[in-house]
Amino acid sequence: MQYLRLFFIGVLLYLAAVLPFILYRGGIFFYYGDYNVQQVPFYILAHRAVRSGNFFWNFHLDLGSSMGGSFAFYLWGSPFFWFSCLFPEKWIPYMMPFFMSLKYGTALCTSFAWLRTQTRTSRGALLGAFLYAFSGFQACNIVFQHFHEATAFFPLYLLALDHAHSAISHAGDKSAGKNPLSVKKGILGFVLMTSAMSVINYFFFFGQVLFLSVYYLIRYASNQKVRQTLKEILQLLLAGVLGLCLSAFFLVQVLDVISGNTRLDDFLLGYDMVAYSEPATPLAILKSFFMLPDLVGRGSLFTSEQIRNSSLSLFLPCFAVSGAIAYLRAHKKSWQRTLLLTCLVIAFVPILNAAFALFNSEYYARWFYMPILLLSLVTVRELEDADCGNLLFGARMVILADILFLLCAFLPTRPSEEAEGGISFLQIMEYPELFVTEAVVTAVMLPLLLVIVNGIEFTGKRPSSRERACCGLVTRTALALVILCCFLTQAGVLLNGNTIIAGSGGEKWRTQLLENRPEIPGYGNASFERIEADGTSTNYEMVWGYPTIHCFESTVSSGIFAFYQGIGPGRTVDSKLNFSHIGARAILSSHYYLENKLIRATKNYTKEGGLPGYQKVGESDGYNIYENRYFIPVGFTFDRFMTEDTYALLLDRDKTAADRTLVRDLILDDEAAAKYGSLFSGQDTDIDEECLSSDSYYSECRKRASTACTSFTTSKSGFTAEATLDRENLVFFSFPFEKGWSARVDGKKAEIVKADFGLMAVCVPEGTHTITFTYLPYGLHAGILVSLAALVILLAYFLLPSPLLFRSTVLR
């Protein structure tokens, strides 16, 4: 019952912070950035997929992608998402704040569970749990709601490691027996939490393993003999591997997506490994210790491109780092001190910080929630010890730092060369109005901090000596003030997030995305076709239910990355093409372009030159609709081909010619060219000047369309097409190449050929034939077998008497 009460307190506190903004928007939570164009569309698309039974492949996710691979980072492993599937799809956008509140309630419970093992009192653990669950990190990442699964369950993973250490270290004690149930439970808990955390979010799991490794070495290994430590590490590794094996059925679906993601190729190198490239970054890190956090993507003071999307915040409501400063002064030797200082060094050394993000060159502070839990602990420890002197010193340091940051906002700046006038003030900040909110909310907390560290009650009387001996400064007043500051932290960030968006933006988002669907004249006449909405309507197609070529999602199929990388534009977090890429649009079966006329009033389709071959065919839901008159249905053949190397040379010389060549030539690697080159009438090795003309391009589009499949249908397992060919040829399909695909022609197994760098083709004989593509995540069967084997081993260990697995005697 205690944890149930805590859970509902956390839920209600977050809902109290977000409710005014829901009411302001007319009953729905509208925020900014990725929340509007990723979190909500992703939930709706995934919810629809689950309800319709599409668990493996989704044709509405970019050019098509694996659900388990592409959404594993966002929601596929989230228990909160699967809970949302119990509700009707129409409810999902309105229930998003409720689902978020469940994560806050969970974080409050799990952090309390770990902190209770470290504090003297339950009240102290509760105060620390509020600091963690409602920290600045939590607030600034409301825009990234999939981060909160990791923060919600991390304290349990830390608790599981503590219990596993205790179990292993006492496994050989005679007083504990050879293999007591408590020892087994300790190991079992760590195995299960390792499995769960790897499924919940594999990206955060990597950072958690690193942090737990540092935590173990500092807290436990430093106090043990080397031989004992090595034995424990080996057993923990075995338990961890067993946990990963238990989740193999899930993780195998991620491997292909990870292996082809171009973002993994960007590593820190050279001086960037030891010093941040932008001088404002260390100052921004310092600011994150003391003040309400910046919005992700909208910095105020010390902002830069490097930290813009970093999720940078180490802020504890009310206390900031005053408790940590006090603890460092009071305790010269403790594992908490060593771990705090280690985290501080890691934060300011780029290569160490990057280790938590797979050494990516982009700056991320997305591991800061883990030291925040430690900051919460040491703050509570100081309060329980009633260390007024050191706490007051810490409070003064926080106040001094906040004053200095405020003064930095007034630093003089020299205007740009184009601007007139001399030195100006208050111009150093990119978003000064956001800094005002940060400063005001932080300033409101400072006197409350002084009230707590001075042990003042609301009545003006100090606690009794008995209460002070029991709880120190963790009084009811202190707890109430901390809860108030937790509310202010979330509300302050939410206020800033609502400040940067126009009032009409929420209404347009609600009307155009959720309540209506553009009716496209002629859509559905083709068996399969894609549309493309402009940049103001990112990912709207997911909600509307139209296949698209425009998608903002970081972890799509590796074939999509390879395709965009090969043809020129490249891809990082989204798939998008300039208006000049008409050839790429054609082979992707893009049929319609939608321009949001309600938003793009000045910078519109016509003024940007438009798309050659497109014409306006109607208006709907605030969109101008343009149809591609030279649309090529999916599944078609080519007469000519070009090798990847030749295309790369052409791309370097003339990007326009290279783009239009995509409609004339199928691009093959050397191996495929050698095997299937004889099927084509010719191979192009240089630019054909004719392909640069519009007439020639349109002619090639008509040729490709004339060879398109006569029928095409998608299913839960893939797609089926019928094609009539006048000769044996490769039939090209604009879906990403993945190892999980298998193809059959008239029921006979056929080889899938990688074409156009990352898409697919299959060899079909002359005549009319049925082509079937079936998708099953590569390695899924093997992953299931590994998971079942791990489950058997785990059950055997837990149920059978005296198993060998994990016994310390085995390692003697």
Residue map of PLM features:
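Contiguous transmembrane helix-bundle modules in multi-pass membrane proteins
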Residues: 204, 335-513, 766-812
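Membrane-interface micro-motifs in multi-pass membrane enzymes
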Residues: 69-74, 93-104, 131-158, 165, ...
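Membrane-interface helix-loop-helix junctions at transmembrane boundaries of multi-pass membrane enzymes
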Residues: 224-234, 323-347
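Active-site lumenal/periplasmic loops and adjacent helix-entry segments of GT-C-fold
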Residues: 20-118, 123-155, 172, 196, ...
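Periplasmic/ER-lumenal interhelical loops and adjacent helix-loop junctions
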Residues: 37-46, 65, 72, 79, ...
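Extracytoplasmic/lumenal acceptor-recognition loop(s) of multi-pass membrane glycoenzymes
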Residues: 70, 194, 482-508, 519-590, ...
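Active-site-proximal, structured, solvent-exposed surfaces of multi-pass membrane proteins
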Residues: 673-812
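Membrane-embedded helix bundles of polyisoprenyl
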Residues: 10-14, 100, 105-117, 123-168, ...
